[in-house]
């Protein structure tokens, strides 16, 4: 009786194994997840480069340097007068 029940089960299991993986269970493509990551990196690089260009072309760094220089000069003069 056991052999009579185990043979059909063995045939079904063997047919499932030999059939191969279902399309949804196939091996995922390795390059697919990395394509999105590469695109994200490229976008981040472009945005960073654009930001650096805007900062270097703006007057903000020059104004900040002038303000720091002027403040430092005033502090030096104040310390000379007090000493």
Swiss-Prot record:
InterPro entries: ApoC-1_sf, ApoC-I. Apolipoprotein C-I is present in acidic (APOC1A) and basic (APOC1B) forms in P.paniscus, P.abelii and P.troglodytes and perhaps also in baboons and macaques. The two genes for ApoC-I arose through a duplication process that occurred after the divergence of New World monkeys from the human lineage. In human, the acidic form has become a pseudogene sometime between the divergence of bonobos and chimpanzees from the human lineage and the appearance of the Denisovans. Pseudogenization resulted when the codon for the penultimate amino acid in the signal sequence was changed to a stop codon. GO terms for molecular function: fatty acid binding; phospholipase inhibitor activity. Belongs to the apolipoprotein C1 family. It comes from Gorilla gorilla gorilla. It is found in: Secreted. This is Apolipoprotein C-I, acidic form. Keywords: Lipid transport, Secreted, Signal, Transport. GO terms for biological process: lipid transport; lipoprotein metabolic process; negative regulation of cholesterol transport; negative regulation of lipid catabolic process; negative regulation of very-low-density lipoprotein particle clearance; triglyceride metabolic process; very-low-density lipoprotein particle clearance. One of its GO terms (cellular component) is very-low-density lipoprotein particle. The keyword Secreted applies. Residues 1-26 form the signal peptide.
